[in-house]
């Protein structure tokens, strides 16, 4: 199971769905964002 877009994630785990990455611009609130 992966974390969808705008879902909460942890930057030290690769838990976002394919095509997304964990963005921590406002730590500790990290969310999955589109790679594009």
Swiss-Prot record:
GO molecular function: sodium channel regulator activity; toxin activity
Subcellular location: Secreted
Asparagine amide found at: 36
Disulfide bond as UniProt keyword: yes
Keywords assigned: Amidation, Disulfide bond, Ion channel impairing toxin, Knottin, Neurotoxin, Presynaptic neurotoxin, Secreted, Toxin, Voltage-gated sodium channel impairing toxin
TM ranges: none
Cellular component terms (Gene Ontology): extracellular region; host cell presynaptic membrane
Known tissue expression: Expressed by the venom gland.
Protein task: Insecticidal neurotoxin that induces an irreversible spastic paralysis when injected into insects. Modifies presynaptic voltage-gated sodium channels (Nav), causing them to open at the normal resting potential of the nerve. This leads to spontaneous release of neurotransmitter and repetitive action potentials in motor neurons.
Record note on domains: The presence of a 'disulfide through disulfide knot' structurally defines this protein as a knottin.
Protein name (Swiss-Prot/TrEMBL): Mu-agatoxin-Aa1a
UniProt organism field: Agelenopsis aperta
